[in-house]
Amino acid sequence: MGTKRKTHKNANLKHLYAKIRGGHVTRYHTRPELTNGQNVAAHTWRAMVILHTLWPEASKNCLLHMMYHDVAEIAVGDLPATTKWNYSEVHSILKRIENDFENSIGIGELFIPITVEEAKACDAADKLELVLHCYELITQGNKSATDVMNRGIKYLKEKYPHEKQVNRALKMIIRLYTMNK
């Protein structure tokens, strides 16, 4: 009885440690001029604030999904989005590895199911955080963030043309950007 309980407790601690370590992954490692010290933990917190602000009715599972959405990068790394876009077979394999890792620590889709609409809200919040991060870099004089910000805006406009929350946020960001140019 004691051994079984200790094994379960150790597994929980390993899962906890894996989840926490995921927050330490540095973002934009292939574009160091964009990092500005941002790691997965900072990005995730900001994305969760965006999600909760724009979609205040977001379910607990939706918020949990957002909280853990990049944790698997501790196991597989942060592959650049452009690589995923240009090599769908690599993206497919990476997604499978990420899902396996997430499920192994109790945070994958099997444990935290979300609806299609919630997945869209999480994706939009994730990309809006990217756009805001780049906007902040630009306002600090880092013009090298402009291309990434513009790609993020284009992605959001094309993928979510009828999503009111996304369009309102983009209008605000674009207005601020053009005012500060």
What does each model-identified segment do?
Residues 2-181:
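Active-site helical microenvironments for divalent-metal-assisted chemistry
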